[in-house]
């Protein structure tokens, strides 16, 4: 990097000058409005380019806070949320982690009711391991290279278990396709045959978008998130003290609900560019530090990883305990970081949080995995899932330049609307087929020769006037926190 070793006074002065210059430019950048930052950002790039290797597109990550003059949603929206919670209590199975369930079974087969140090249980050599790190694939041994290993075979058989929920969806899907319908509706009478379940949600965050905010509101439900419900907004705490106070209130409710346990924040910095997600104020009393230092001043007591033991009660419930404090530990991860490819302990603690309090969103299930078109799903004026198209590369001739007329004919045949979203994980790219430059972007995506998922764009209606400024109306996403009294 461009900061030099501080062997003498001149080097120290150079480092101080560099840091002060960087701080000055960052402050100047904050003062400018969104459209006037380019020259300052270029100066930052030039300053850092002196001996530092970095990706220019990912160097800076920015959060923006716009002061809201007034923010109100009516009781009609909260009533719709109540209906959504009722829907999931009857209809949709919870999103259990297959990795976590497999770990429970393998742990109980090996240790039964024993209480084992967590670092031992998750060690792929002496214990079981976790996720991609197990006793079968945790290490790379040159003596085994070239030998077949079924545990490393990433091909899998899709589970086609035809549950009552799947059977209902098949019936409605086939009716919609036969009649050429763009959506299916799930009715209360459809839910009568399903047993109501406790959703295990002491508190939760509801993610939604308001599509119309009148007497009969229409919303797009993104999901109901359990576990550490502050994870969705914690990275924005530093922007406003009101947000920080709100997150603190959420975290305190966790401690009240688990009053006989230790609620501990997991603190881990797994890789570069994750610091902006992981580093945030935290008012929890306890913290679990894993390959990181306790950088937050708020955590008063640190629980070392080697102080934690694990057991699986009757092969069902995973229990973590502190040997020193002789109490059960409830780990919390108040960030939205994807931990699937993390180290075993970090991935395990994250999955444990999600199993302690479930999350819910509509899922078509594996039976519909490869369908080229899935209609919109609605329940009680709530869009549970937008319409979706799966585009395979072989739908277009290879080595041929696709022109606009051919693309338009294909779009009409597939009944794809003018405005859609290309979705890749959590990322979405807006495409309007009436805009030539956006059509070119769409064609460039097709040339990448990978399957593309398209999703209908739902914000075109003139009724969407929830978020307004001098520039006009905007799309919106709301996060509403709920808790049991």
Please name every model-derived segment.
Residues 262, 272-274, 278-302, 306-485:
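Long C-terminal appendages of very large multidomain proteins
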Residues 4-276, 317-323, 420-485:
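Type-3 copper protein
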């Amino acid at each position: 990097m461009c900061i030099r070793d501080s062997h003498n006074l001149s080097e120290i002065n150079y480092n101080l000058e560099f840091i002060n210059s960087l701080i000055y430019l960052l402050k100047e950048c904050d003062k400018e409005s969104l459209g006037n930052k380019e020259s300052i950002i270029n100066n930052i790039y030039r300053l850092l380019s002196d001996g530092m290797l970095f990706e220019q597109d990912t160097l800076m990550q920015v959060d923006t806070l716009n002061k809201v003059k007034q923010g109100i949603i009516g009781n009609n929206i909260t009533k719709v949320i109540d209906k959504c919670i009722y829907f999931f209590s009857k209809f949709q199975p919870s999103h259990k982690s297959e990795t976590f369930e497999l770990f429970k079974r393998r742990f109980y087969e090996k240790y039964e009711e024993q209480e084992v140090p967590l670092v031992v249980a998750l060690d792929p050599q002496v214990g079981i391991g976790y996720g991609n790190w197990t006793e079968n694939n945790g290490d790379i041994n040159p003596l085994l290279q070239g030998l077949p290993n079924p545990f490393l075979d990433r091909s899998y058989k899709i589970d086609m278990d035809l549950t009552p929920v799947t059977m209902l969806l098949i019936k409605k899907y086939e009716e919609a396709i036969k009649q050429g319908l763009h959506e299916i509706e799930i009715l209360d009478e459809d839910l009568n045959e399903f047993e109501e379940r406790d959703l295990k949600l002491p508190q939760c965050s509801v993610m939604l978008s308001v599509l119309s905010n009148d007497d009969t509101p229409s919303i797009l439900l993104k999901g109901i998130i359990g576990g550490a419900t502050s994870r969705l907004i914690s990275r924005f705490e530093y922007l406003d003290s009101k947000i920080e106070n709100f997150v603190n209130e959420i975290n305190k409710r966790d401690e009240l609900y688990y009053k006989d346990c230790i609620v501990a924040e997991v603190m881990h910095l797994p890789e570069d560019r994750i610091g902006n997600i992981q580093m945030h104020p935290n008012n929890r009393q306890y913290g679990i530090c894993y390959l990181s230092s306790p950088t937050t001043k708020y955590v008063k007591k640190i629980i070392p990883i080697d102080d934690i033991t694990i057991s699986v009660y009757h092969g069902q419930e995973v229990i973590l305990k502190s040997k020193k404090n002789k109490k059960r530990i409830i780990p919390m991860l108040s960030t939205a970081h994807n931990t699937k490819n993390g180290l075993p302990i970090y991935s395990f603690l994250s999955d444990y949080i999600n199993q302690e309090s479930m999350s819910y969103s509509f899922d078509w299930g594996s039976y519909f995995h490869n369908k080229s078109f899935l209609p919109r799903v609605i329940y009680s004026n709530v869009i549970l899932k937008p319409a979706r198209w799966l585009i395979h590369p072989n739908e277009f001739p290879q080595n041929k330049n696709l022109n606009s007329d051919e693309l338009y004919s294909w779009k009409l045949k597939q009944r794809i609307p003018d405005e859609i979203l290309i979705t890749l994980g959590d990322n979405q790219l807006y495409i309007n087929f009436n805009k030539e430059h956006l059509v070119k972007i769409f064609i460039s995506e097709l040339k990448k020769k990978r399957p593309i998922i398209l999703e209908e764009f739902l914000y075109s209606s003139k009724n969407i006037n929830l978020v307004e400024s001098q520039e006009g109306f905007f799309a919106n996403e709301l996060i509403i926190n709920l808790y049991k009294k």
